[in-house]
């Protein structure tokens, strides 16, 4: 196999992986539309996961609390991959995480796909909890 065909194979594999991720993401979006009546964006999905992980439903959250909930979501999503671990909760019930290893260098699209992949894994492992 020459290096040209090897490079083409790698490009094809990357495209297939992205296409598979996109299809799985569309399937998740469709199930969330069915559940909530509209298509949530990535931030809304992170917010919902944050509420799920926080475990307390409130009438309203402040802007800072909403950001904290999205941070909880990201830490919870990346914990199974070894990036974070739960250290405990404070007196108000807010979870606190410790970063175990740095995030890989990624551009914005790669970061979004990285998060989407972890969100899909979360929904696979916590089916029907949102």
Regions found by a protein language model. Name each.
Residues 61-111:
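Amphipathic protein-protein interaction modules
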Residues 102-129:
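Helix-rich interaction surfaces within compact, conserved domain-sized segments
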Residues 15-54:
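N-terminal low-complexity, intrinsically disordered segments
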Residues 34-42, 60-69:
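Structural motif
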């Amino acid at each position: 196999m020459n290096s040209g065909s090897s490079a083409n194979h790698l490009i094809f594999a990357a495209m297939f992986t992205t296409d598979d991720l996109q299809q799985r993401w569309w399937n998740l979006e469709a199930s969330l539309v069915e559940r909530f009546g509209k298509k949530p964006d990535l931030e809304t999905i992170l917010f919902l996961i944050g509420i799920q992980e926080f475990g307390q439903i409130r009438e309203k959250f402040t802007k800072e609390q909403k950001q904290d909930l999205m941070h909880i979501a990201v830490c919870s999503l990346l914990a199974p991959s070894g990036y974070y671990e739960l250290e405990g909760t404070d007196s108000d019930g807010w979870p606190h995480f410790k970063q175990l290893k740095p995030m890989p260098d990624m551009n914005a699209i790669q970061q979004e796909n990285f998060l989407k992949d972890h969100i899909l894994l979360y929904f696979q492992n916590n089916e029907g909890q949102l």
